[in-house]
Amino acid sequence: MQCIETNNLQQLLEQVKPYTKKGKLATYIPELGNANPNDLGIAIFHKETEYIHAGNSQTLFTLQSISKVITLALALLDRGEEYVFSKVGMEPTGDPFNSIIKLETTSSSKPLNPMINAGALAITSMLAGNDNEEKMERILQFVRDITDNPTISYSSKVATSELETAYLNRSLCYYMKQNGIIDNDIEELMDLYTRQCAIEVNCIDLARIGLIFAMDGYDPYKKKQIIPKHITKICKTFMVTCGMYNESGEFAIRVGIPAKSGVAGGIFGCVKGEMGIGIFGPALDANGNSIAGFKILELLSAQEGWSMF
């Protein structure tokens, strides 16, 4: 597969930049409302030629729902498939990512998948550790290993902002606790979950995460397996079916690669055996995905023949 050049990335960014005007910030999390809606950046991390980047590619932003892929991988390492999927399902949903509807209407009362908020909260509740500090350090160290960036941390301001306004997520937790899906202290779980979502990265970090998943968990630069292959396979399957909220089907048709988005404007994707892509564009569409980020991935996929279908 031919390597993309930096000037090509810059041209594509300029081409899709007008789309940022059509999106909106995720103001329901107050700190995210302070982002610049015109920001747009991209990085591509290739298995052989390291990375190229353009635009606001070194601006820090929080993972938000992208962290769900990280914690799913950790939970599978900690607990194994049988336990994890006894508590969380494997099916996509047409409901909003923060909806409680399916919890109430499915006979098992378990979340449909790990990429919706209820499922992600259940996954976080499974992580090993004596307390939240130990669990959070494990999550951070996992992200540092994948990104090869030892400075990765989280934004306490964003975490606090989310914790103070997470009324719906608390209700999801209480409902799941009532039905035996989780048994954690709710406030402790919410504290850990909001900190996990507030982990800060830039596009280059995100592209490197994408590369590791593209290589089935293998780091071609460190020459070692970071995540077991079977776990990356599970994670990437969920990224295809559920990774882009209620646009996952359209994204599969228009772009055709495993990807996960977050409401801070991040998207990471992976082209199997080749490269990872990291994008930041905080102006979101109606489904909570970066509106310009979606478009640039659509153009790149068409140009480079990325689709897996």
From Swiss-Prot:
Catalytic activity: L-glutamine + H2O = L-glutamate + NH4(+)
InterPro entries: Beta-lactam/transpept-like (IPR012338), Glutaminase (IPR015868)
Keyword Repressor on entry: no
Endpoints of the signal sequence: none
One Pfam family matching this protein: Glutaminase
Keyword NADP found: no
Amino-acid positions noted as binding substrate in the UniProt annotation, renumbered to this chain: S65, N117, E162, N169, Y193, Y245, V263
Biological-process GO terms, alphabetical: glutamate biosynthetic process; glutamine catabolic process
GO MF assignments: glutaminase activity
Highest rank taxon of the organism: Bacteria
UniProt keyword annotations, A-Z: Hydrolase
EC number, UniProt record: 3.5.1.2
Family: Belongs to the glutaminase family.
Subunit structure, as described in the record: Homotetramer.
Protein name: Glutaminase
Source species of the chain: Bacillus mycoides (strain KBAB4) (Bacillus weihenstephanensis)
Gene for this chain: glsA
